[in-house]
Regions:
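Extreme N-terminal tail/first-helix region
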Residues: 1-20
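Hydrophobic/aromatic-rich structural module bridging two neighboring secondary-structure elements via a short loop
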Residues: 53-60, 65
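Short beta-strand segments
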Residues: 22-56, 72-73
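Helix-adjacent hinge/juxtasegments
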Residues: 62-65, 69-84, 91-94
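A generic structural signal for short beta-strands and their flanking turns/coil linkers
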Residues: 23, 39, 46-48, 66-70, ...
Length: 173
């Protein structure tokens, strides 16, 4: 079995749980010069899609209007393992334990006011779970002042490296 198979998160529910816990994800689009542009963003995962909010103008939106294929990534570093725990002279043994999700998807601007409201309220619920805000309504003018980008996954892969790649004698059980 390849190492990649060992690291794969096989449960879609676990991937969703991870995405709902993380606060920052990164959207990658292609700029006018053909280079990747990666931007950290707050996000919410709702109805099997990623939603992010944005200003109504900007490079990210320009990129998406020209090429709607995007990447999205969220990760959590669990622990850095310095090499000297294994061998005081071999730096190649340093490692990082982590969880990550990578999405390749299609980005679109949300124009439906009900969907936009759902996404923005979802963001508020995620980042301010204690409440103390008034939920948005689809007829509010404030919806005109913000863009909502929806990323519809074409592929979605989760990976976790938590020591399962180590020999059993090297793991602390």
């Amino acid at each position: 079995m390849q190492l990649v198979d060992t690291l794969k998160i096989k449960s879609y529910e676990k991937i969703k749980e991870f995405l709902n816990q993380e606060h920052v994800g990164r959207i990658s689009s292609i700029d006018v010069n053909g280079f990747p542009q990666i931007i950290p963003m707050n996000f919410v995962f709702l109805n099997d899609s990623v939603y992010i909010h944005s200003h109504v103008k900007g490079e990210k939106l320009d990129n998406i209007s020209k090429n709607n294929k995007v990447g999205f990534e969220a990760d959590r570093e669990l622990e850095f393992l310095p090499s000297y725990f294994e061998d005081p002279h071999n730096a190649s043994l340093a490692d990082t334990l982590y969880v990550s999700v990578v999405i390749k998807g299609i980005a679109s601007l949300v124009s439906d006011r009900d969907e936009k409201t759902l996404a923005l309220n979802g963001l508020m619920e995620k980042y301010q779970p204690e409440g103390y805000y008034d939920p948005l309504q689809s007829n509010m003018r404030v919806l005109n002042a913000v863009s909502v980008i929806k990323i519809t996954p074409q592929t979605l892969h989760g990976k976790y490296k938590i020591g399962q790649h180590m020999n059993s004698k090297d793991r602390m059980n």
